């Protein structure tokens, strides 16, 4: 497809929107980019240098602009006026993911990882497995670097491992991963999707354009993901911590075993040998193993990476030990399910820092889990009162409502004793106080390391 002279409207100027606008302008398209919010002057100047026409503080009228194509950013709800009007006029609406897919060099094989929790860890692990096996592989997508920004690094015939979100999958029209994995589905982003059913349907779209020779990897222990197998046109592999599925990965006396339907059972390693700890990371490791085996990675090489892969930043990331207290950064825990997995990954007494902006979640189950695990609960941000109510109903009395994030970290440190863990796992989004979960995690690490320096 020739982009020269094509009129493209980019709606939303977050990371992926800016990357899409820049790439399209370089390809010769006439790009108009808009956002309701203001942008930093440096970002504006970079876009202007590429010839992008900017509209800030609102949206242009699609009927007047008459673009050939609309690119939507993940943070823009699908019902926003320019997107709805474009669809009504028959103008294609793509996500940045769809755009990047269409711009890939020939022969590239795509692995797509989605799910409510574990996406980034599993995506990073899959990429590392391929790279350590000597395969040309690029990791990107929702993991932090928009895929369209990495196109120059992707060679013909190579591999792309991308983390994909429900928001990105809403606006795909041909995105075709040779291997797609849905790790788990629990209520999340319901403020955006409107219902759990809509959220599940968005996640399932990762398999929408697969073919019979492709692979879909699903969590057998999760009823939502397991139920999606019937709609898959590709070969389905399951992973399970509890029982042996028809085909896929399971545990046998603690050893990870895999059967893809040809070649018999492959035994990898004991789950205690995995570098990533916690039951949720066992699931992530099993999913990554199936991805690798489906692509043809040597089992011995795969096992070596499973045993040595380091922790991913902001996912149960050890920060420091101060006076016998271990500090853990789990800023990526942006929903109750993620935080429940985090607090159950350790047996030590926990001081938990939680709170932020609720994404439509119910905190009841989380509070019940905290009641048996958390010795002191420090709450901060917009959802602090809502979390406090759920916690008190669950019988938790040791609660502190912090006026700001730094106060929350100081309170948690003061409440901890040698042998305890202070964990940031907010169960909420970061947007009430920070740009993103990465910034929140970085601030937490900075505050902890400052305490260590102060002695």
Curated annotation (Swiss-Prot):
Query: By which gene is this protein encoded?
Result: murD
Please explain the role this protein plays, according to its UniProt record: Cell wall formation. Catalyzes the addition of glutamate to the nucleotide precursor UDP-N-acetylmuramoyl-L-alanine (UMA).
Q: Example GO molecular function term?
A: UDP-N-acetylmuramoylalanine-D-glutamate ligase activity
Supply the EC number(s). 6.3.2.9
What PANTHER family does UniProt report for this protein, alphabetically? UDP-N-ACETYLMURAMOYLALANINE--D-GLUTAMATE LIGASE (PTHR43692:SF1)
Where ATP binds, per the record, is at: 115-121
The name under which this protein is listed is UDP-N-acetylmuramoylalanine--D-glutamate ligase
InterPro entries listed in its UniProt record: AlaDH/PNT_NAD(H)-bd, Folylpolyglutamate_synth_CS, Mur-like_cat_sf, Mur_ligase_C, Mur_ligase_C_dom_sf, Mur_ligase_cen, MurD
Q: SUPFAM superfamilies, per this entry?
A: MurCD N-terminal domain (SSF51984), MurD-like peptide ligases, catalytic domain (SSF53623), MurD-like peptide ligases, peptide-binding domain (SSF53244)
Pathway participation: Cell wall biogenesis; peptidoglycan biosynthesis
GO cellular component terms, alphabetically, are: cytoplasm
Q: Which UniProt keywords apply?
A: ATP-binding, Cell cycle, Cell division, Cell shape, Cell wall biogenesis/degradation, Cytoplasm, Ligase, Nucleotide-binding, Peptidoglycan synthesis
The record's annotation in Pfam families points to: AlaDh_PNT_C, Mur_ligase_C, Mur_ligase_M, MurD-like_N
Q: Which family does it belong to?
A: Belongs to the MurCDEF family.
Domain of life from the UniProt record: Bacteria
| Catalytic activity field | UDP-N-acetyl-alpha-D-muramoyl-L-alanine + D-glutamate + ATP = UDP-N-acetyl-alpha-D-muramoyl-L-alanyl-D-glutamate + ADP + phosphate + H(+)
Q: Where in the cell is it found?
A: Cytoplasm
What are the recorded Gene Ontology BP terms? Answer: cell division; cell wall organization; peptidoglycan biosynthetic process; regulation of cell shape
List the taxonomic lineage.
Answer: Bacteria, Bacillati, Bacillota, Clostridia, Moorellales
Broad enzyme group: ligase
